[in-house]
């Protein structure tokens, strides 16, 4: 990567840690991020068989709070936060423009009755924050905490024992798409039972001040369980194999949730939200293209369960060849 380009990119608080353990860094969404450590195939297979640790601190965290918080969230997303969320619950949802196009797909965490955290894609943070602020007619408080948050993921069959040895929380009791606040080696963390690999896994949020110490503890535990650090290359092959879409690549503002097999995350009956009228019209006319992402989708919260994830080996192998060619070039 040219030096002048590298200097213009954002870096996570774990940048120097990645350099120390030999990561190959690339530009992604305005960030300088690890694409691989050992090699993409090895990292991919290690997540499938054991456990991998990921730095996802380039993702965005936007907190909406106050008396008008829920009303604003309901207006912004297609899914039904009011009807489905309680404290500690997580909801997947598209966020659409008036034409029904997907501005972003995100996770909504209910931290309290009047406090929600939206986790958005890295390349969309600024645009999403401005969009949310522009539609804040309910005097909610909106805070972009992205630069002050470190997000580390553990994904794979051994992620439970990797995390449990360090946590004061019984992580086996955290159900899929739920979270709990706790301590990991005395560091305050949100422990979220979520992931983007199609495996058992957790995503861990903490203040950026504690990020390096949290990584060090989790990294040592991961290695002890036979795991590896994993870059964005294997993260992409893992999500492709699991059939999970990437905003900006598979879905964007030119595609609607109905076209993207995301109708399970659209609640037309909940009341008004941005894009609702366009989606109602599209549903009635059925005049739209369709992508086969989720052949077995059915859960009202998120359909990505271990029992129904398709194993897309052909996509995995094809992408690995492409990714390795690009990494070597």
Locations of the language-model features?
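Glycine-rich, acidic
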Residues: 9-15, 26, 32, 136, ...
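Residues forming anionic-ligand binding surfaces in small-molecule and nucleic-acid pockets
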Residues: 46-57, 102-115, 142-145, 185-201
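Short glycine-/aliphatic-rich beta-strand segments at the starts of folded cytosolic domains
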Residues: 52-78, 90, 145-164, 286-296
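Glycine-rich, small/acidic residue-mixed loop/short-helix segments
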Residues: 255, 260-329
């Amino acid at each position: 990567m040219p030096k002048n380009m590298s200097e213009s990119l954002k870096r996570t608080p774990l940048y120097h840690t990645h350099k120390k353990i030999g990561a190959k860094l690339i530009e992604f969404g305005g960030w300088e991020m690890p694409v691989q450590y050992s090699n993409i195939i090895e990292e991919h297979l290690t997540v499938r068989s054991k456990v991998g640790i990921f730095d996802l601190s380039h993702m965005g965290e936007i907190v909406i709070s106050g008396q008008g918080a829920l009303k604003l969230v309901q207006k912004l997303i297609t899914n039904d936060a009011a009807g489905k969320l309680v404290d500690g619950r997580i909801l997947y949802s598209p966020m659409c423009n008036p034409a029904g196009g997907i501005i972003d797909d995100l996770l909504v965490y209910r931290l309290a009755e009047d406090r929600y955290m939206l986790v958005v894609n890295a390349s969309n943070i600024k645009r999403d924050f401005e969009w949310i602020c522009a539609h804040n007619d309910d005097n909610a408080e909106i805070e972009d905490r992205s630069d002050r948050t470190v997000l580390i993921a553990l994904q794979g069959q051994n992620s439970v024992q990797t995390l449990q040895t360090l946590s004061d929380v019984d992580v086996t009791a955290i159900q899929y798409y739920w979270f709990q606040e706790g301590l990991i080696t005395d560091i305050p963390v949100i422990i979220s039972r979520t992931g983007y690999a199609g495996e058992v896994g957790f995503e861990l949020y903490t203040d950026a001040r504690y990020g390096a110490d949290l990584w060090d503890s989790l990294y040592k535990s991961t290695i002890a369980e036979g795991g590896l650090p994993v870059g964005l290359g294997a993260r992409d092959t893992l999500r492709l194999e699991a059939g999970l879409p990437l905003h900006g690549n598979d879905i964007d503002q030119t595609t609607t949730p109905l076209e993207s097999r995301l109708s399970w995350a659209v609640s037309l009956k909940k009341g008004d939200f941005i894009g609702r009228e366009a989606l109602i019209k599209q549903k009635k006319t059925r005049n739209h293209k369709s992508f086969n992402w989720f052949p077995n989708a059915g859960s009202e919260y998120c359909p990505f369960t271990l029992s129904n994830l398709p194993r897309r080996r052909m996509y995995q192998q094809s992408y690995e060849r492409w990714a390795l060619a690009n990494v070597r070039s």
